[in-house]
Swiss-Prot record:
Its cofactor is Mn(2+). Serine/threonine-protein phosphatase 4 (PP4) occurs in different assemblies of the catalytic and one or more regulatory subunits. Component of the PP4 complexes PPP4C-PPP4R1, PPP4C-PPP4R2, PPP4C-PPP4R2-PPP4R3A, PPP4C-PPP4R2-PPP4R3B and PPP4C-PPP4R4. The PPP4C-PPP4R2 complex appears to be a tetramer composed of 2 molecules of PPP4C and 2 molecules of PPP4R2. Interacts with REL, NFKB1/p50 and RELA. Interacts with SMN1 and GEMIN4. Interacts with IRS4 (phosphorylated). Interacts with SMEK1/PPP4R3A; the interaction requires PP4R2. Interacts with HDAC3. SMART domains: PP2Ac (SM00156). The gene is PPP4C. One of its GO terms (molecular function) is protein serine/threonine phosphatase activity. This is Serine/threonine-protein phosphatase 4 catalytic subunit. It is an enzyme of class 3 (hydrolase). Its EC number is 3.1.3.16. InterPro entries: Calcineurin-like_PHP_ApaH, Metallo-depent_PP-like, PPA2-like, Ser/Thr-sp_prot-phosphatase. It comes from the Eukaryota. Binds 2 manganese ions per subunit. It catalyses: O-phospho-L-seryl-[protein] + H2O = L-seryl-[protein] + phosphate; O-phospho-L-threonyl-[protein] + H2O = L-threonyl-[protein] + phosphate.
Amino acid sequence: MAEISDLDRQIEQLLRCELIKESEVKALCAKAREILVEESNVQRVDSPVTVCGDIHGQFYDLKELFRVGGDVPETNYLFMGDFVDRGFYSVETFLLLLALKVRYPDRITLIRGNHESRQITQVYGFYDECLRKYGSVTVWRYCTEIFDYLSLSAIIDGKIFCVHGGLSPSIQTLDQIRTIDRKQEVPHDGPMCDLLWSDPEDTTGWGVSPRGAGYLFGSDVVAQFNAANDIDMICRAHQLVMEGYKWHFNETVLTVWSAPNYCYRCGNVAAILELDEHLQKDFIIFEAAPQETRGIPSKKPVADYFL
């Protein structure tokens, strides 16, 4: 069981916010790929489970999330993407989540967000961070290859559909999602792009997204989708909400946001959603990790796109 003890040591190291060696990243990504390649585009997840939104490289706040929500493997987690970019510790954040996935594959589910993309990470921080911390782009390459293997969505007990962004005019059924070839860079348009980029909007039908990708979708679209697929609700992330979570359309869509004091300046709280075995909901609200627990690195300029 040398592999397990190696993994446990790497997890311990990453929990201390210490980097693992480039050769270890390569091996970790190879193991992760073997696990992720078996997962469906609509990955089945059993309750009880704790559902989390965007993390964005806020490593010490991810540790705070585990402090309030429980550690893996005692708690079963589903993370809805956007592990990287904007925060100071995208490398440590993503590698920790990946190491936990390899160590406890049935206790943590990772699905893809719009930032799990080569193009986006070259603009919003992860690429530069890999270069700065490892001295080359090799680690970024290993990680972005893994992004292509991440599932596009999950379904909890057949009743709660979880996706990073939202719905697509090209998709009416979960089976249509299952047929997408996901092992690629996030396209600029089309169903795979929409799942990762779309947002709910207080309207009916479909609207043009101000993000330049995906769509705005209304309450009638959600009602049709939920009925067609016999699901109770859609759970998604992708949008900052100051209270940590927000209901839309008469509690048929839920936004969960898990990066407190986003970008170290927004002043928002974060939330995670605990679902018990009967899918009863309990929200845990938490604030940013206290200052004394973090080593804040020198502030680096980031592109000021703020969505």
